[in-house]
Amino acid sequence: VELYLEDTQVQDLSPIRGMPLEKFYLSRTPVRDLSALEGMPLVELNAVECPIGDISGIAKSPIQMLWLTGCPVEDISALRTLPLVSVTLHRTKVKNLGPLTGTALQRLHIAETPVTDLSPLKGIPLTRLVFTPANITTGIEVARALPLQEIGTRFDESSKDLQSPAAFWTAYDAAVRSSTK
């Protein structure tokens, strides 16, 4: 079962509590509270540009694909036990990736976030990483060791710069060398 409420003025999700939703799209709505989603069989949740700060309501859902671009969320501990495949935290306030440690995550978008440490990603089978290299102070070697197929700094509707890890790291290393001269 799918429900699309994108670009509506819906604020209160309590009327859908208990529905057997598997895909839920509520991007660009004024929704702040996800508690009504607790226990739903959600596999996909798209909540781009919503004022959601607390995602604890999805902690018991089997979410595999999650988009939170532009949400003011900071704490992602609710993601710790989810069977995630793809997570987009682009332009969120997330700083700590620790809750993702040990997951089977394949795609992660953390560009334009305050994340500075990639160490929690060690051992995760990521095939795509989108991030802001200039923000990273710890764990860049962890990113180099990931089994990536694509890596970049932008991946949204307006722009994509994904490339092979070999091409990305060659350009990254050249930029680092030129900045230390």
Residue ranges of model-derived segments:
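Concave beta-strand-loop units of leucine-rich repeat
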Residues: 1-11, 15-95, 99-116, 120-180
